[in-house]
Amino acid sequence: MTYNQMPKAQGLYRPEFEHDACGIGLYAQLKGVASHDIVKKGLNMLCQLDHRGGQGSDPLTGDGAGLMVQIPHAFFKKTCVELNLPEKGRYGVGMIFFSNNEDERREIEAYINKLIEEEGQTLLGWRTVPVNVGKIGKVAKESCPYVRQVFIGANDSIQDDLAFERKLYVIRKQAENWAQARQNRFYFTSLSSRTIVYKGLLTPEQVDAFYLDLQDEDFTSAFALVHSRFSTNTFPSWERAHPNRYLIHNGEINTLRGNQNWMRAREQQFVSDAFGKDLPKVLPILDAEGSDSSMLDNALEFFVLAGRKPAHAAMMLIPEPWSENPHMSKEKRAFYEYHSALMEPWDGPTAISFTDGKQIGAILDRNGLRPARYYVTKDDYIILSSEVGVIDVEDENVLYKDRLSPGKMLLIDLEEGRIISDEEIKSEMAHAEPYQEWLDEQLVTLPEVQEEKSEYFDDLVIRQKSFGYTYEDIHKYLVPVITEGKDPLGSMGNDTPLAVLSDLPQSLFNYFKQLFAQVTNPPIDAIREQLVTSTMT
């Protein structure tokens, strides 16, 4: 049985409708000092988020759990002596899920080896990741992948670590496109010289026991990003567990179909000095078979590797409300307005934490519909999670505690050893380029549509019929509001024909339905919450 058990589209089921809600966590040493204790406490944090994860009928098979850490250089130097690894940062590690078909695995490995050579990098070797399947659930065990790591050395001509990250990305994308065309299944959980992801169809308690690497004292990192997945209305699988390659995500992207279509439409217009002639090799940017979280990760990864700072890319994808905010600086408003013409917001209840291995950020959606709280300690640690209490901290060691506000960002720079505030990082991004000047010179706006005078109907019933009012609208909704001054109560069910199939006249609004995960989305009041609401699309 393959590790990927995702069903194909059939009947009323469509994979693109899937969303999930989860628990996220970050534990980091602000000065960038790596230790095994951070990994252990990250795993403990993950276990504390167990109640935010899901399980199937098999209680030992979770919806997914995992963690992202920095490349544990000392650990790999010890365990991969025969590979003669170069210094830290001069090699990348790919963590790969293969099917248990040995012939298929060898074929894919051979092709990856070929791509590494073609892209001018050095194949250092392969390693089978030791795992313990004894304590995982039956369903997880039946679909358990064969986990391997590939080690790739950087060409001597590459001195910029971002250029090396970009080359690893080019190798990965070509391998994925080749395998998809041949209907071969494999999955890179990560391929980077900075970070590595250990995850799977596991419960939080199983991650440490399943991946034996994590138990070694030489397995160190300056941060741990952890995630416990709850599949609200999705099918769990090994590759859909988090972390993704750049981010962890709690929530759902309600605008996914539009984001996906616009990204695909713009790909033919992409020009990149960073990628150069390699750009066609990495298309398409989004993995159409991925979840909403993985597609958001695909977009963030591409923009970062194309040269934008992680915070810049995050501000493009998940902007704070700007069109109705009178208190926003003109420079920041110009930044958001400029980028709104390039990229539609990936909107929906969202809390994400993201990293490129050097900077770690966290951001909330414009409505603040997902929780994210954090502590900063006097001994230079930060703890961020969906809730407090995930790691024990003595009260006297707490420097300060806070929560992320709607649309706001938190950024940690491990190289500078400090936390950068939302105001500072966004001011830096807004002043980096003359965005207002570019808007004045290049933005083409359409004149506003003037409202035409319509025929006046004095009769109330005629007006109500014209606008599609029904008996239920008047007597069940309006009358209670007028006579009793309270909102009427009603069920969510609606067994009337869809407007497009009805023989009766309908209100224009009845012809449109919003796609979203009903389970986890609270109602939005576009009038009272005008600041965070926009009709611009």
Walk through the language-model features, giving the residues of each.
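Conserved short alpha-helical segments that host acidic/polar catalytic motifs at enzyme active sites
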Residues: 1-536
